Amino acid sequence: GPYTPGTAYILLMRPLSLASSSIGAGHDPRRQYLRGSTGLPIGGMGAVTRAMQKSIEASGGTIRVGAGVKQIAAGMTGIEGVELDNGEFIQATTVASNLHPRTTLVDLLSDPLQEPRFKQNVHQLPQRGSVFKLALALDGVPTFTAAPTGLERAYASCQFRLAPSLDYMERAYDDAKYGRPSEEPIILGLIPSLTSPDMAPEGKHIMSCNVWHAPVELTQGSWKDERGKMASRCIEIISRSMPDLKDRIIDYRALSPLDLEDEFGLRDGNIMHLEMMPSQMFGLRPLADCSAYTTPTTGLYLCGSGTWPGGTVSGIPGHNAAQTILSHIK
């Protein structure tokens, strides 16, 4: 919660980004990569992935999809390759993984030289997430009561945040702390189909919401029972600011933390992989032994949200890891 010591670190990300920016980027929020939400890709977040794919293929690279990794194999001199679920073995001396550090270093890596203590330290990394996902299919754009006349559509195209006070946010966290889904959750939402019309049929829209807090383990009941209840509470809360929302809902889909882990590999539903706290940042992310995108296994690199500077879609972990890999190859 906001009153937990160390959580103010998140507020430092903007000044950190500004201080590390070039002079030309000082007044351009799009080039301050830790600043936070500064724009939307046309086509949704999937457009970012598609652009990366085109860039890789244009440079002669090959992308394999639907190819689950069974094992990252290493020998006495380092990485030897990757074994796929279908039994195929791809030889390689360099592997970069943007999976959760624990998934990479504990579940997938087979290294005869890996120290048991290091493996134990990775296994013990604090990773509990508490996010709940809600997607709404809408018939038209809901009315935003706070939008000035004439600016309704402009306001609707921006991200909305429903967390009216620090006390409200702390209460939402307290519920989860004791194993209960938040009665009055924090909600961050967006209608991406306003800026990317191809995401929905004409006249229809999609609202995407990230919701906090939803503990992985519940003290009572199960997420099978609580998923729909949490979704209904979220819709009620959003409706306070958009009174015609319920009338516009065609359908919805809700994902609990367990769903996010099962479908997307987000361990414990943590979209940041690890805690975004000072104890897990800078040279300690994910551990001091592998804080510079390297690992104790020669040729294995980390490049996901479990490395500095953490989650959100900044591209910085991948960029920094690539620079490290290139410096080792030269």
Task: Enumerate the predicted regions with their spans.
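Secondary-structure capping and boundary motifs in well-ordered enzyme cores
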Residues: T4, P41-V48, S97, Q124, ...
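A broad, structural surface signal
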Residues: G46-A58, A74-T77, L84, S97, ...
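Conserved flavin/dinucleotide-binding core of flavoenzymes
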Residues: T143, A147-K330
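Short, conserved active-site loop motifs that form the nucleotide-linked donor/cofactor pocket
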Residues: G61-T62, L300
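Beta-rich nucleic-acid/ligand-interaction surfaces
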Residues: I63-E80, D251-F264
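Beta-strand segments within the central parallel beta-sheet cores of soluble alpha/beta enzyme folds
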Residues: G1, Q53-K54, V65-Q71, A92-V95, ...
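Active-site/ligand-binding neighborhood in enzyme catalytic cores
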Residues: G1-S59, L266-Q280
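Mid-domain catalytic core of redox enzymes
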Residues: L40-I42, G61, K70-A200
